[in-house]
Amino acid sequence: DADFNIVESASSGFVSLNLSDDIDNDEGYRLVVGKNGVEIYGKTEKGVFYGIQTLIQMLPSNIYEKSNSSLVSSVVIPSLLIDDAPRFSYRGMMLDVSRTFFDKEYMLKFIDALAYYKVNTLHWHLADDQGWRVEIKKYPKLTEQGAWRGAGEVLNPAYGSGNERNGGYYSQDDVREIVQYAAERNITIIPEIDLPGHSKAVAVTYPEILCDINTI
């Protein structure tokens, strides 16, 4: 995150963000670097956002450093013109948090990385045999028990999780925050609950959902 001063008239070295009907693709952009500064044009805010990502990719990596000794005081970008638009409207990544759980803080960083590479869809695999990861208030045992693996847990250790209690889940507020955070970065989240297949985490916490073999 960064803070920017918004001004009505620009001086040398400014970055100007503009909406333009001259851009054909809703996610396309034009990036112009000239002697007076940087201009980014997009047909929509999405296009402008992707133009900003390209500009960021031109900057040295130590702009992300938190140490004052590593901070960049100035950056010189050569004059250039980039007209860019996505070839594919769906640019997705799938993250399986059932088999390997990643907490909310990791998810937010992961979403930042997706935005950096202009990925616009996150397929979020929230439930499988190895863990249930989203809070359902009507069925609390899904996360009280079904979100944890280890010796003595209802789910056995798997995928290198070890014998100690391992796992976690997202509260409903966590999910809302993650979805909003992604939307602000032009990323749509597709949540996946793997049912009725791969439903061990449900079956061991609420066995009453299982079919009675004698009635089949």
Per-range role (PLM):
Residues 86, 130-184, 199-216:
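Aromatic- and acidic-residue-enriched carbohydrate-binding clefts of CAZyme catalytic domains
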Residues 110, 178, 189:
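Aromatic/hydrophobic pocket-lining residues that form π-stacking "cages" and hydrophobic walls in ligand
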Residues 51, 105-107, 124-126, 133-138, ...:
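Short, solvent-exposed loop/turn and secondary-structure capping segments
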Residues 1-88:
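Contiguous, structured surface segment used for ligand recognition
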Residues 88-91, 118-120, 183-187:
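Short, well-ordered coil/turn segments that N-cap beta-strands
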Residues 93-129:
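A conserved hydrophobic secondary-structure block that centers on an alpha-helix together
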